[in-house]
Amino acid sequence: MPYYRAVGEIPRKRHTVFRRPDGGIYAEELMGEEGFSSDSSLLYHRFLPTAIVKTEPVDVPPDLVGTTPNMPLAPRHFRTQELTTNGDMVEGRRLLAGNGDVRIGFARTDVPSGLYRNSVGDETVYIQSGSVRFESTYGVIEAGEGDYVTIPTGTIHRWVPHGTVTALTIEASGHIRPPKRYLSSYGQYLEHAPYCERDLRGPSGPLVVEGEEAETATPVLVRTRGGLTRMTFAHHPFDVVGWDGYLYPYAFNIHDFEPIVKKTHAPPPVHQTFEGPNFVVCSFCPRPLDYHPEAVPIPYNHHNVDSDEFMYYVAGDYAARAGSGIDIGSISLHPAGFTHGPQPGAVEASLGARETTEMAVMIDTFRPLDIGPAGRESEDPNYAWTWAR
């Protein structure tokens, strides 16, 4: 995170004695990235965060593995509206696509998740519809439609939906951050950035479980590069009375993104919202369109020779895909090796348009995306030929 926050009770100096009301000492825990060389936060626990009483292996659900190459190479259309789903926001995810850098999944659920810690990398979860309470050792974030919730590696958390929630899950192999070009050398958002610190929502207060539950042994599902482990802590891990630092979960709503408009059509990098290891996340939002009198206000045909384009259509009308079968909830995958662009007739139909209502989340990856079980299950077999109609 690019700025400092302090929540709850903390001592004036770090690494000093901080006493509980009963005279004991709070247990200090450093959550830090890149071996003490990057962002970190200090958390103060009522109980030892190191106290575990049991570990056991957990089989990885079949739907979270088993990607296959996009072969024969083709553009794809996944219809998430037709996916069968069960389980919660963690164990009920359906894997759409992935590679060694990022895994992209889909969840639709009204079931609270168990406690979970992803120790492989950061996650960003986009809430397509519904609302959910995100609980973690850092506190609570209430998230709803249009929110990106970004979760640092190693954060113990759970999801508690308020009714049915639909979400796109982005699991990185490293850290997800604001683009470097939006930040000063000291981490402040610059004036040209399409969003800033005021748009970000972190936990506003600690979440401390009280009573008998606090002292009950509590299981946490832990994901590492080696697989899944059920780790049972001696006490409930939601025992943090305060924390401070630059590393914490936060929410950013897509409606707070400030689109950049040019005289002629602007390329996707102007919509960039986050960056991860070998991928970027972009937000396409309602906006005025290009204002040159002869402008073509939809994308030109383009061949991204170094990246695959994964686009989740979340609201509005995406004019470039008119007639393709793409609808709200659809996903297009346009891989490197294929030139893509507007559907036939879309250019002519767009001329003279002054604004767009489109809203989409795009993930560009710089290594090829393989297709997951949910992608295969939901694929429209006719999409690749729609430009030839």
Where are these regions (language model features)?
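Jelly-roll (double-stranded beta-helix
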Residues: 1-389
